[in-house]
């Protein structure tokens, strides 16, 4: 698999100057906002926001909450060389891909035993992570326990001669 490097540059820019993406579908409960502010206060920025150039300025793809939490700060931004359609795909998949990761309970237990925080919201996040109860932190949406596989009943998988998979609605 050939992977393209789409990062044009790393810029430092005032967070309030970044344009929020009007298609951003993620919402951020108060518990998440508080925990992020706590981590930023204790550690600072250790990861870049993601944006693309538009005629109106840099539009966010990833990092909306960090930008909102620190509007007066100069923040690191990875500027990507992607078009609007590619940005939409990233916006739709970036967080869900991360949330698909599993848990190694032994390693998580060891890690949590070794970390401390002076921030109440961060400590509550760590407790919830330890209890595997992030949903108990507050107003997170209830996604349910199981995937309803019935939603795929009308979808047909087609494999073309080159081996690519395509999905279409059954006729």
Task: Locate predicted features.
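Aromatic/glycine/proline-enriched transmembrane-helix motif characteristic
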Residues: 1-171
